[in-house]
Amino acid sequence: MACPNWRVRLAARIIRGGGVIAYPTEGVFGLGCDPGRKAAIERILQLKGRSISKGFILIAADFVQLQSYLLPLTASTRSRLEVTWPGPVTWLLPARGDVPPWLRGRYDTLAVRVTAHPLAACLCRTLGHALVSTSANRAGRPPAQTTLQVRRSFGSSLDYILPGITGKRAGPSEIRDGRTGQRLR
């Protein structure tokens, strides 16, 4: 189901066209694009000054949008996820072999999250698939928490900034290892 918010529909159209946007998440603004658009991923890497070896987070409106990227999960792993989703917890889960290295970096896992942020979830629903998510900041700088901070950091180098307010979380999402449950960030 698509979102009635015209700004979300505009953001989705830009992403489908290969664009890069900024949008609010649970704790900070994120930079996002279509996970299948390598040129858009490369643009984000250039904007942030980030290495491709780190990989990216994919956010989604629901787990179904993430399944095509992941190996089948055990019942106990699924249970761990369900307790934290939707929400600000990102899980590192075993990636399928055909997941491109520009998404997973140098790892055999992929960082995924079912977002609890209403605009971000609405954007994923409107797109009909998961969205690349990385904090809106240049390497070594703090993540943007407002539209104004995004504009100051990136100027006109983004195709669109989806206006909105971040969630109540202070800072980026927590990251956990899906195999062990261990908190990594």
UniProtKB/Swiss-Prot annotation:
Gene source species: Nitrosococcus oceani (strain ATCC 19707 / BCRC 17464 / JCM 30415 / NCIMB 11848 / C-107)
Catalyzed reactions: L-threonine + hydrogencarbonate + ATP = L-threonylcarbamoyladenylate + diphosphate + H2O
Location within or outside the cell: Cytoplasm
The name this protein goes by in its record: Threonylcarbamoyl-AMP synthase
GO molecular function: ATP binding; double-stranded RNA binding; L-threonylcarbamoyladenylate synthase; tRNA binding
Chain's role: Required for the formation of a threonylcarbamoyl group on adenosine at position 37 (t(6)A37) in tRNAs that read codons beginning with adenine. Catalyzes the conversion of L-threonine, HCO(3)(-)/CO(2) and ATP to give threonylcarbamoyl-AMP (TC-AMP) as the acyladenylate intermediate, with the release of diphosphate.
Gene Ontology annotations of biological process type: regulation of translational fidelity; tRNA threonylcarbamoyladenosine modification
HAMAP family membership: TsaC (MF_01852)
YrdC-like domain sequence ranges: 5-185
Pfam family, one: Sua5_yciO_yrdC
